[in-house]
From Swiss-Prot:
Name assigned to this protein: Cell shape-determining protein Mbl
Family: Belongs to the FtsA/MreB family.
Gene that specifies this protein: mbl
InterPro entries: ATPase_NBD, MreB, MreB_MamK-like
Annotated GO biological process: cell morphogenesis; regulation of cell shape
Gene3D superfamilies: 3.30.420.40
Keywords carried by this UniProt record: ATP-binding, Cell shape, Cytoplasm, Nucleotide-binding
Record: residues binding ATP: 12-14, 156-158, 204-207, 284-287
Database matches in NCBIfam families: mreB, PRK13927.1
Entry's localization field: Cytoplasm
Disruption outcome: Mutants are bent and twisted at irregular angles. Depletion leads to a strong defect in chromosome segregation.
Functional summary from the UniProt entry: Forms membrane-associated dynamic filaments that are essential for cell shape determination. Acts by regulating cell wall synthesis and cell elongation, and thus cell shape. A feedback loop between cell geometry and Mbl localization may maintain elongated cell shape by targeting cell wall growth to regions of negative cell wall curvature. Filaments rotate around the cell circumference in concert with the cell wall synthesis enzymes. The process is driven by the cell wall synthesis machinery and does not depend on Mbl polymerization. Organizes peptidoglycan synthesis in the lateral cell wall.
GO cellular component, one term: cytoplasm
């Protein structure tokens, strides 16, 4: 039995794994629950996420990746090992080749950390590839043609924006403004306006169910419970789409600005292609209501949300694994 090639979208919020010949076989939160006293791993992924904010003092649920890079090496390694063992992709005599995606502007030290964690978790050859490039492939863009393609990949920790032509990134930007920051903005808004403390999971719920970032694009409301900062007792309030739009306005403006700067640095010939083809948004942030409308209005180009935006990077790794022999031999070490 030979080992299978696997592609990993090692995200700040979720880990997706694509196994060659099988498709996406794993999609779990990047969360690990540890016993603080012994350092023992108690749960990984979905099971650990359910513990967030609900555990006794000696159990901590941590996210080992922050802003798209490894914040806790040992825990990342334990998490990857757990997921890979779960899949049973190792051969009797061989280890799998791995293709892992990372943000565009990470340092060589950060690249090395990702590579080492993957090797220790059972990878034979580990290849690193830039996330927006893989997301563009997963979204079905023809990036190996001599024409301009622009992708905005909004994950949990980072937003990666890139213009790609002939299979390479021409201009790009990676900013630490993405899904997690949106949740924090909502959480802080509720705290400020209502003197109510809510958890990150509630903030994420609000984002998914009622949020919009384009004025008047959505009119919905949600009842949420939290702890009153004055009385210390539980209290229920209703939050609407207009309030969430206000809470997210500044954060989204940062992404719009970064996208504008990438477009401004793009050679004119490629800009003309982008005006024709449009910009594609991928990642979980692409599901934020009204974001495509806002970007289209600000960038003055068509903007499309990819099909299955959250899976684009993992799908892209699958395409790249199938064409591994044709790809430029660029093993990042």
């Amino acid at each position: 039995m030979f080992a299978r090639d696997i592609g990993i979208d090692l995200g700040t919020a979720n880990v997706l794994i694509h196994v060659k010949g099988k498709g996406i076989v794993l999609n779990e939160p990047s969360v690990v629950a540890l016993d603080k006293n012994s350092g023992k791993v108690l749960a990984v992924g979905e099971e650990a996420r359910r513990m967030v904010g609900r555990t006794p003092g000696n159990i901590v649920a941590i996210r080992p990746l922050k802003d798209g890079v490894i914040a806790d090496f040992e825990v990342t390694e334990a998490m990857l090992k757990h997921f890979i063992n779960k899949l049973n992709v190792k051969g009797l005599f061989s280890k799998p080749r791995m293709l892992i995606c990372c943000p565009t502007n990470i340092t060589s030290v950060e690249q090395k950390a990702i590579k080492e964690a993957a090797e220790k978790s059972g990878g034979k050859h580990v290849y690193l590839e830039e996330e927006p490039k893989v997301a563009a492939i997963g979204a079905g863009m023809e990036i190996f043609q001599p024409s301009g393609n622009m992708v905005v990949d909004i994950g949990g920790g980072t937003t990666d924006i890139a213009v790609i032509s002939m299979g390479d990134i021409v201009t790009s930007s990676s900013i630490k403004m993405a899904g997690d920051k949106f949740d924090m903005e909502i959480l802080n808004y509720i705290k400020r306006e209502y003197k109510l403390l809510i958890g990150e999971r509630t903030a994420e719920d609000i984002k998914i169910k009622v949020a919009t970032v384009f004025p008047d694009a959505r009119h919905e409301e949600i009842s949420i419970r939290g702890r009153d900062m004055v009385s210390g007792l539980p209290r229920t309030i209703t939050v609407n789409s207009k309030e969430v739009e206000e809470a997210l306005r500044e954060s989204v403006a940062v992404i719009v600005q970064a996208a504008k700067q990438v477009l401004e640095r793009t050679p004119p010939e490629l800009s003309a292609d982008i005006i024709d083809r449009g910009v594609i948004i991928t990642g979980g942030g692409a599901l934020l209501n009204g974001l495509d409308q806002l970007l289209a209005e600000e960038l003055k180009v068509p903007v499309l949300v990819a099909e299955n935006p959250m899976d684009c990077v993992a799908i892209g790794t699958g395409v790249m694994l199938d064409n591994m022999d044709k790809l430029p031999k660029r093993k990042l070490s």
